[in-house]
C-alpha cells in the first residue's frame, strides 16, 4: 500500500510503502514533514474494492450498507473526527484509516474508480503553528467494525478522564416540553414531579436569556435564535432566578443551563459588534449566526458572561450547545481556536465547581473533546426511539465504556401506547435516560411506565456505569446491545437475542416488534405485570443457578 505525502501545491516530498498484511501500520508525520508541507498537507492512498460492502464515519448515525461513488468527510476538533472504516456484509472490518491529529481542520475525499476497482482517497489537513507530529494509521485487521473505532480512541486517549457521579444521573430537560415558553412555577412543578420519578439533573434549555415566550413552529423558526447571544438573564421572564435554582437544587437536582458560546442572534448586541469586526462565519435561516472563535470578543465577553451567570446563580453545569456550528474549513480553519475556548470554559467552570456537569452534543462527542465534557448526548430525535438508540450506540462506539453517554430527551404523543413509551425508555438505556415532557399533563399510566424504568436504571446503575458494552449490528442497524460486569448482563434485543452469559444473571429487554420466546425466572410486560412470553416493551429476568 503506497502512501504519498505532498504540500498544498501537490509537490510530493515523501512516500512510504505499507505491507499488504492484516495488521495495524502507521506512518509518522514528523515535524520536518509538517515544515515541508507549509500550511497544507495532503495524504493520498488507495483501497482495493475487495469484499467491501459498507462503511462508517462519525458523520453517519448508523453504518451505511452501500458503496459511495463520492464520499467527503470534513472534521476538526469541534465537529466529527478523521476516521473511516470499510467493512464487509457481516460488518467485519476490511480496513480503517485515521489521523491522530484531531484538532486541525481536515477533509477526506474518496472517489470510486471503476477502471481500477479501487477507492482513491485523499486527506487534506490544514496545518497550524501548533500542529505537532502525528500519525496516519491503516488498521487492516479483520474485526467487528466497532472495534476499529475503539482502537482509534485508545490510541488517542488510553485512559478515560474521571467523570463526576452527577453525569450518570437521569435528566429532565425543558426543551421539547416547553421550548422557550415557561414560567418559574411551571418549571418547579415539573421539577417536583421529575424528582418523584427518579430524575436528578434538571436542564433549563433555550429561552432564559430573553423576554419572549414562544414555542417552536413554522412562524417562529425563521427568527428563533435571533435574541440569543448576549447571555444576560431575563429578569422579566425569570424573576428571582437564583432563588428558583436553589429551590430546585433543594429537591435533589443538579441544575444545568443551556448556552451556545459560538452562536449569536441577529437581534443581539453582540451580533452587531461581531459584524463590525468581520467575525461572522455563517448566517443561518433561523435568526442565528456562527461567531468566529478567533475573534477576541468570544474569549473576552461571551465566556465571562456565561461564567458570571454560572457563579451568580450557583449552577451545577452547562449544556454547551452548537459548538459544531463552526464548520470545519480548509480556508478558514478554526478547529484549534474552538478547542482552546472550550478548554478554557471547562477549566474555569471546574475552578468554580470541580464536579461541574458539561454536556456536549453528538457531532462533537469525540475523543478530542472527551477531557472537557461530562455528558455526551445523542443529537435531536424527538418521538423517535429507534434513532435515539442508534445515536446512543454510535456515541458509545466512539467513546467506549465508562463514559456518560446521554440519550436525547424522550418525548411522545399524549395518547401514545404504554408499549411504545416503554420502548422509548429501553432505547434510552443505551445511555443515561433523559426526558422532556410537561409532566403535569402526562397520564398516570405513562408516569407508571417511566417510574418503573427509572427504578430499574437506578437499581442497575453500577452495571450501566462500569460495565463493558457490546453493540451488535445487522446490515446497518443495531441488532442488540449488552452491558455486563462480573455479576450480570443487561441486554436489549432489537432484531436478535444476544447470547446469554455464563454464570451471570441475564436481564433481557424487548425492543423488537414481536413477542420473544425466552425462558426466565420472571417476565414482565411494559406495565410490570407477569407474562408468559417476553412482549415488546417488557423485561425478563434470568438468574444464574
Stretch-by-stretch model annotation:
Residues 1-158, 515:
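N-terminal accessory beta-strand-rich subdomains and adjacent acidic, glycine-rich linkers
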Residues 168-172, 176-307, 311, 315-317, ...:
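Aromatic-lined carbohydrate-binding/catalytic grooves of carbohydrate-active enzymes
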Residues 239-248, 253, 337-356:
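Alpha-helix-loop-beta-strand connector modules within alpha/beta enzyme cores
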Residues 266, 271-300, 304, 343-441:
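Glycan-recognition surfaces
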Residues 317-348, 363:
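P-loop NTPase motor core
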Residues 425-467:
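Catalytic cores of secreted or luminal carbohydrate-active enzymes
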Residues 426, 472-522:
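Carbohydrate-binding surface patches
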Residues 517-545:
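C-terminal beta-strand-rich structural cap/linker in extracellular carbohydrate-active enzymes
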